[in-house]
Swiss-Prot record:
EC number: 1.6.2.2
Biological role: NADH-dependent reductase for dph3 and cytochrome b5. Required for the first step of diphthamide biosynthesis, a post-translational modification of histidine which occurs in elongation factor 2. Dph1 and dph2 transfer a 3-amino-3-carboxypropyl (ACP) group from S-adenosyl-L-methionine (SAM) to a histidine residue, the reaction is assisted by a reduction system comprising dph3 and a NADH-dependent reductase, predominantly cbr1. By reducing dph3, also involved in the formation of the tRNA wobble base modification mcm5s 2U (5-methoxycarbonylmethyl-2-thiouridine), mediated by the elongator complex.
Originating organism: Aspergillus clavatus (strain ATCC 1007 / CBS 513.65 / DSM 816 / NCTC 3887 / NRRL 1 / QM 1276 / 107)
Protein name: NADH-cytochrome b5 reductase 1
Gene: cbr1
BP GO annotations: protein histidyl modification to diphthamide; tRNA wobble base 5-methoxycarbonylmethyl-2-thiouridinylation
Enzyme class at the top of the EC tree: oxidoreductase
InterPro entries, per database record: CBR-like, Cbr1-like_FAD-bd_dom, FAD-bd_FR_type, Flavoprot_Pyr_Nucl_cyt_Rdtase, FNR_nucleotide-bd, OxRdtase_FAD/NAD-bd, Riboflavin_synthase-like_b-brl
GO MF term list: cytochrome-b5 reductase activity, acting on NAD(P)H; NADH dehydrogenase activity; transferase activity
Membrane topology designation: Single-pass membrane protein
Keyword Heme appears in the UniProt entry: no
Cofactor(s) required, per the database record: FAD
Superkingdom of the source species: Eukaryota
Keyword Nucleus among record annotations: no
Subcellular location(s) per record: Mitochondrion outer membrane
Amino acid sequence: MSALSSENVNGVYIPSALLVFGTFLVKKEFVPYAVALTAVLAGFKLFTGDSKARKVLNPTEFQEFVLKEKTDISHNVSIYRFALPRPTDILGLPIGQHISLAATIEGQPKEVVRSYTPISSDNEAGYFDLLVKAYPQGNISKHLTTLKVGDVMKVRGPKGAMVYTPNMCRHIGMIAGGTGITPMLQVIKAIIRNRPRNGGTDITKVDLIFANVNPEDILLKEELDKLAAEDEDFNIYYVLNNPPQGWTGGVGFVTPEMIKERLPAPASDVKVLLCGPPPMISAMKKATESLGFTKARPVSKLEDQVFCF
């Protein structure tokens, strides 16, 4: 936060000046003591004000955030790191929710808005990261590819019906396709971060089916494999349309048989999370229903057994 910000002017400098001036009017010889006192209090206020984590998201208004870094993962996938106003700021995004990005796109009659889930969390202050795959028809994803470091992006949030809380169910099954892994990773990391061995209370089991076309399309594989290796209650099953020779994972589309074998069976304390391309999600809704899960609604609610991001 700037030393000349309105918060400091109204909360530090003006009260300090009034204290010194008031002391001068009442008893001039006490002015040096008043100056010393205000210096100490102002210094404390400035220091603690800068060190306190502040949630910056606004659910009703778009704000502009500066692109700090761009890391290319492949020819059409990048991680965009946006800076928050000050190093101690956090987004203030509940686990399971997402943000809206907006931009004016040439040829579009009005501002285009799309939803994305950061792959960073509020444990990482001062910035947030977005993993984005650029699609030929993707207005916002293509717009992001044109941004240079120092450019800004309009962001609003949080939004979404899912708010994950520790132990909200005994066992979670996940089915993700492509960039649909981002909300899953957010939940997975929150669960593992809050395990008893890490000082938390979350004992939720998590099984993930992650489907992609080619091996090189598997996003965040290194991080996912590391999490699975460190946590015995988190398991991943990869599925590829075009597997390499010697592939031991699933092949083709995700089937009811794969779901039955790899994910928990229907129960009152079980939840299935879905995120991926629309055709895949449509197929997964039918598959989970055929296995005895409650039929997924067109628009998911937190209490649903099958929840679609």
